[in-house]
Amino acid sequence: MPRVKAAQAGRPGPAKRRLAEQFAAGEVLTDMSRKEWKLGLPIGQGGFGCIYLADTNSSKPVGSDAPCVVKVEPSDNGPLFTELKFYQRAAKPEQIQKWIRTHKLKYLGVPKYWGSGLHDKNGKSYRFMIMDRFGSDLQKIYEANAKRFSRKTVLQLSLRILDILEYIHEHEYVHGDIKASNLLLSHKNPDQVYLVDYGLAYRYCPDGVHKEYKEDPKRCHDGTLEFTSIDAHKGVAPSRRGDLEILGYCMIQWLSGCLPWEDNLKDPNYVRDSKIRYRDNVAALMEKCFPEKNKPGEIAKYMESVKLLEYTEKPLYQNLRDILLQGLKAIGSKDDGKLDFSAVENGSVKTRPASKKRKKEAEESAVCAVEDMECSDTQVQEAAQTRSVESQGAIHGSMSQPAAGCSSSDSSRRQQHLGLEQDMLRLDRRGSRTRKKAQK
């Protein structure tokens, strides 16, 4: 799903950027730490960059089982530079491993940064970055499954995405564009999912000081229109609550097959107003997307919790995970770390032989589509504009009034969160009664 930008509504487009020259297999690049990397075959090309298979330099050619990829673009282009800053600050292997260890995770779906540098070829300078290699993206799998994921799979995916968001948020960044095409399966383990494309990752809290809430008409509707946050619709810089709101829309689409505003994506104001209306009436959103009786109560509780967040408030990530875990219990399941991409009907798995084939294809896929890992020229210019905006004074947001700093909100808001926890317990009890009836 392509981004829908305000540039399409009359703003001038960015200046054209140079295309990357294609390198031959076997070319050796030397990163800033003097480590050498050998290129394999190209596996993707976008508007101005290329992606190649890569491995540490040796006398052997880089094979199809290469563990890494290298992203290359002309050094005077912007996207890779922006993405590189995120990886250097937040995605070094030792940082990720420390987080996994201290938070007792099996893995963390943030690609690891292995190195970067500049490379001269034919009198031209190129910037490159080495990162992990991945398999298929979730958008392809979603479409192959008639645009449905099972309820268990949606909840499993979302738990892992919450792990990712907590990590990048704690490292002062927000993603701003969570969607299926930016979620890639591990090349070797189809039960692991990774969030990619940090070309527009926004440093919302540099040096511990949160950006202030400020609406900028020039920035309205930034992002992928059907998923972007209400803040983004109003031209406000990305924040933690925006990432969580976007994840909520993804969950609803993955489970129901659509979002209520998808019928008129040509009108950004219609999309914005629809989201505001449904944010204020989550029950109506659930009724619209899930007209059947078996509604996913955990998603409603998640959306209710997220809408209480202030612009600068630190989310209670474990509370959100607990909501989704209660949803798994309600359907008689648990967080087993398995992603089942079988065909589904009405949120339930419908087994068919082809599902094993698709899972194998997802596991063996060597395609890292450059469109899923790089941003467009328009995104680059607009990201630069966002970073240049000076935040002056707080403005009340429709989601709630911003608070100062990067801390959590006051005790009254905590009481609202406690109320949600009580709702979660009621949801769990209803799930238990449902299972007992089924056993009888």
UniProtKB/Swiss-Prot annotation:
Catalytic site: D177
Outcome of substituting D263G: Results in impaired Cajal bodies assembly
Gene Ontology biological process terms from the UniProt entry: Cajal body organization; cell division; chromatin remodeling; DNA damage response; Golgi disassembly; neuron projection development; positive regulation of protein localization to chromatin; regulation of neuron migration
Residues that hold ATP according to the record: I43, G44, Q45, G46, G47, F48, G49, C50, I51, K71
EC number of the protein: 2.7.11.1
Activation and inhibition: Active in presence of Mn(2+), Mg(2+) and Zn(2+), but is not functional with Ca(2+) or Cu(2+). Has a higher affinity for Mn(2+) than for Mg(2+). RAN inhibits its autophosphorylation and its ability to phosphorylate histone H3.
Post-translational modification: Autophosphorylated at various serine and threonine residues. Autophosphorylation does not impair its ability to phosphorylate p53/TP53. Phosphorylation by PLK3 leads to induction of Golgi fragmentation during mitosis.
Location within or outside the cell: Nucleus; Cytoplasm; Nucleus, Cajal body
Record PTM Phosphothreonine, positions in chain: T378
Cross-link Glycyl lysine isopeptide (Lys-Gly) (interchain with G-Cter in SUMO2) placement: K71
Catalytic activity from the UniProt record: L-seryl-[protein] + ATP = O-phospho-L-seryl-[protein] + ADP + H(+); L-threonyl-[protein] + ATP = O-phospho-L-threonyl-[protein] + ADP + H(+)
Disruption phenotype: VRK1 knockdown significantly impairs cortical neuronal migration, and affects the cell cycle of neuronal progenitors.
PANTHER family reported in the protein's UniProt record: CASEIN KINASE-RELATED
Family note: Belongs to the protein kinase superfamily. CK1 Ser/Thr protein kinase family. VRK subfamily.
Protein name, entry field: Serine/threonine-protein kinase VRK1
